[in-house]
């Protein structure tokens, strides 16, 4: 029994030493300025081995870190020969998201463990990457490449969701500018449900140089600039103050994209409570009901023609008349709601009057003059 325990202990020790060797190899290669093809192979081999054998939390954290960083090591190995395409491969949404996650996870682990191996480097790397990504996105926006700019702003958000909520809003707005309304709907929904929208604060201050109020980005940065004498008159504003406008935008997008009608109804009703005099919302709300009703009766002329052809056949005639009434009965609630939303609309008034007459409700038809 002791031999078995000893063997297990020995195997565990060997595995532990192997993991330490792999970590040393990865750390050494990762720190190099110039990476050879041999280094690249050694890095990949050590990374794969560490991922398979890691059992301790620290080993798992760094196994994920080194695996995720592999594309950056590949790029570094190409040196001056790296093409624009090689560099842009690091700007794929999937990698940017993983890159941001692994940086945050590694920073959190090193803070918890008190052993800061990469923290200072990663904090700088994170900031530099965000600045670079933001600069590219802004340049694309300035050259009217809205779809591409939207994609990069969204990637910036997925890279650092806690700090880049405003980038998600930029992505949504630019998707609209690019006329990609389906993507805009997705981004605006995500923005509306984000922690940034619900709890975020915008930190404003007036630039002394030009007298304009500007969004400084963070409370810490604003305090610093005010202390330097560059800004004055600080003001805070909750992000969700724009709730009415975001709901308005979502209402228009849901209508544009012919999205779920219940979702549109709930959104436009909530938006109109906040913006009761908004004409676009009024029209969107009206059309939501009117169009659903009209969709049901759009083939009524054909049905009337069929009915007129069978006046000599009472059975078929009665069946078609009954069927027509059933269709108008289904459409009635939509026309009534449309009329309630916009009682001055002549189309709604006339079609509602006709519907009442077809359904044998003459009193309601007369009242609807």
Report each predicted region and the residues it spans.
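Bacterial Sec-dependent N-terminal signal peptides
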Residues: 1-26
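Post-signal peptide N-terminal segment of secreted/secretory-pathway proteins
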Residues: 29-141, 145
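Short coil turns that delineate tetratricopeptide repeat
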Residues: 55-58, 111, 161-162, 196, ...
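Structural register within alpha-helical repeat arrays
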Residues: 60, 67, 74, 136, ...
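TPR alpha-solenoid repeat register
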Residues: 63, 165-167, 200-202, 246, ...
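Residue at a conserved register position within TPR or TPR-like alpha-solenoid repeats
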Residues: 71, 140, 174-175, 254-255, ...
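Structural motif corresponding to the intra-repeat A-B loop/turn of tetratricopeptide repeats
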Residues: 74, 143, 178, 257-258, ...
């Amino acid at each position: 029994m002791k031999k078995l325990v000893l063997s297990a202990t020995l195997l565990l020790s060997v595995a532990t030493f192997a993991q330490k060797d792999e970590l040393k190899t990865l750390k050494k290669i990762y720190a190099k300025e110039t990476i050879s093809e041999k280094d690249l192979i050694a890095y990949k081999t050590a990374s794969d081995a560490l991922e398979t054998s890691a059992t301790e939390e620290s080993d798992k954290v760094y196994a994920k870190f080194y695996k995720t960083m592999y594309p950056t090591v590949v790029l570094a190995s190409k040196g001056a020969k790296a093409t624009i395409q090689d560099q842009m491969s690091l700007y794929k949404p999937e990698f940017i998201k993983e890159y941001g996650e692994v940086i945050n996870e590694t920073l959190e682990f090193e803070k918890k463990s008190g052993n800061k191996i990469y923290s200072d480097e990663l904090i700088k790397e994170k900031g530099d990457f965000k600045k670079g990504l933001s600069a590219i996105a802004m340049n694309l926006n300035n050259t009217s490449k809205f779809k591409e700019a939207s994609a990069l702003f969204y990637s910036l958000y997925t890279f650092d969701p806690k700090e880049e909520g405003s980038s998600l809003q930029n992505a949504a707005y630019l998707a609209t500018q690019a006329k990609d309304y389906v993507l805009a709907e997705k981004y605006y929904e995500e923005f509306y449900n984000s922690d940034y929208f619900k709890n975020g604060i915008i930190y404003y201050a007036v630039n002394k140089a030009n007298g304009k109020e500007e969004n400084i980005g963070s409370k810490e940065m604003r305090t610093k600039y005010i202390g330097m004498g560059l800004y004055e008159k600080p003001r805070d504003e909750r992000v969700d103050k724009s709730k009415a406008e975001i709901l308005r935008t979502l209402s228009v997008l849901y209508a544009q994209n012919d999205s779920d009608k219940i979702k549109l109804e709930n959104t436009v009703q909530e938006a109109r409570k906040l913006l009761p005099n908004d004409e676009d919302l009024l029209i969107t709300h009206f059309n939501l009901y009117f169009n659903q009703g009209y969709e049901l009766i759009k083939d009524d002329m054909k049905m009337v023609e069929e009915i007129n052809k069978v006046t000599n056949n009472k059975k078929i005639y009665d069946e078609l008349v009954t069927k027509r009434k059933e269709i108008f009965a289904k459409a009635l609630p939509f026309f009534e709601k449309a009329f309630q939303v916009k009682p001055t609309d002549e189309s709604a008034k006339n079609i509602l009057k006709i519907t009442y007459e077809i359904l044998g409700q003459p009193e309601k038809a007369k009242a609807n003059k």
